[in-house]
Regions:
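Alpha/beta-hydrolase active-site loop signature
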Residues: 15-16, 40
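Catalytic-site signature of metal-activated, phosphate-bearing donor transferases
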Residues: 19-25, 42-165
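Short aromatic/hydrophobic "clamp" motif used to bind/position activated sugar donors
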Residues: 33
């Protein structure tokens, strides 16, 4: 990272993805904030589209730009499933991440969709129990989950074959 900039920051991990993204966004200085995960890929053609989009921002002034996020691939590794995700956000007080797991920014103001694809190319399995552990910690701390968190908690319980817990 230091080969590109001297602006490299350290965030002490605390099982909260929204806190990590909000920390990163707090360091942004431009009119817009763009994010990627370490295992996201932007192909060359998509990079050209991003540069074209960058030139249009001053004229269109969107608050949130939703880009395609590929998360499923066919047998030839070509993207086969995607959804739109907030990727480029106007730097303002409304660009706030929520959710310790499966974090998101609630869309605000002028929202546009662009035909630009980011590919999620997960490397390795990581900690298969991480999300479940965080959800259970949230329940111990708060006693309840938001409807969105309940949905993802149910999925984690299902993935861990805790079907009765997932159904309740």
């Amino acid at each position: 990272a230091f080969s590109f900039t001297d602006k490299v920051y350290d965030f002490k991990w605390k099982d909260d993805f929204a806190a990590a993204r909000n920390f990163a966004f707090s360091r942004g200085t431009g009119d817009y904030l763009f994010w990627l995960d370490a295992d996201d890929v932007v192909r060359q053609e998509e990079r050209r589209k991003l540069m074209d989009l960058k030139r249009q921002l001053d004229d269109e002034r969107p608050d949130v730009v939703m880009l395609k996020y590929a998360v499923g691939y066919d047998g030839d590794s070509a993207p086969s499933f995607f959804f739109y995700r907030e990727r480029l956000l106007r730097r303002c007080g409304k660009a706030v991440w929520k959710g310790r797991i499966h974090e998101a920014v609630e869309p605000f103001g002028k929202v546009v969709r662009e035909d630009i694809m980011i590919e999620h190319r997960k490397v390795g399995t990581g900690d298969p129990d991480r999300n479940l552990r965080i959800f259970e910690q949230m329940l111990r701390e708060k006693g309840k989950l938001s409807p969105r968190d309940q949905y993802y908690y149910g999925k984690e319980l299902y993935y861990h074959r805790r079907y009765r817990d997932a159904a309740s």
